[in-house]
Amino acid sequence: DCAHQNQQEKTFIDLIITKQIDGMLLLGSRLPFDASIEEQRNLPPMVMANEFAPELELPTVHIDNLTAAFDAVNYLYEQGHKRIGCIAGPEEMPLCHYRLQGYVQALRRCGIMVDPQYIARGDFTFEAGSKAMQQLLDLPQPPTAVFCHSDVMALGALSQAKRQGLKVPEDLSIIGFDNIDLTQFCDPPLTTIAQPRYEIGREAMLLLLDQMQGQHVGSGSRLMDCELIIRGSTRALP
């Protein structure tokens, strides 16, 4: 809430003023307090990991979310799917914007019209994935495959599809995003996009240490490779 956010901002500012922070590794797409680009120059060194916010002009380590999403949707098309739905994350999150763009660009490249009804949104929770899946299943022509912006929402979608009597992947293919540990053990195991979380964290920390030691580190992206991991939640249409 607003009071909690204000307290958080005050805490960070106090730490900076008292020089208790030598550097900051940001895991979100915004600063924990308001600061202009000019004001940022007086802050401790900062590196952004996993997210991408070009307006902050920070060194950033992340994957190419657009290409990763494109590859996932293109894979579904190659498996014969043409009614491909998308369970997207929050509209205000940059990575969700890029993942949705990847979905849209893949459909267009494959000659499929983008139908807004096939795009549902959630907040990265299991419950949101379940609700979004039901929204897609209620369509006159529901999708035969769904690309989800997160594994947690994909697991919610998988659960809801089963509750509606659908078999995955026989009746519906589902792809997630992140390759969290649980995806290997759900039934069926989830096809997903794996991010190199350790490597992203390591590279971001090395960039931060370079800055803290007085080296110049330019702003902009350092892209890490990701991988589409094929498991049991997707199959080719007969």
Kindly give the residue locations of the regions a language model identified.
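Short beta->alpha connector loops
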Residues: 3-6, 27-32, 152
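Bacterial carbohydrate/catabolite-sensing allosteric modules
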Residues: 11-18, 23, 33-35, 41-48, ...
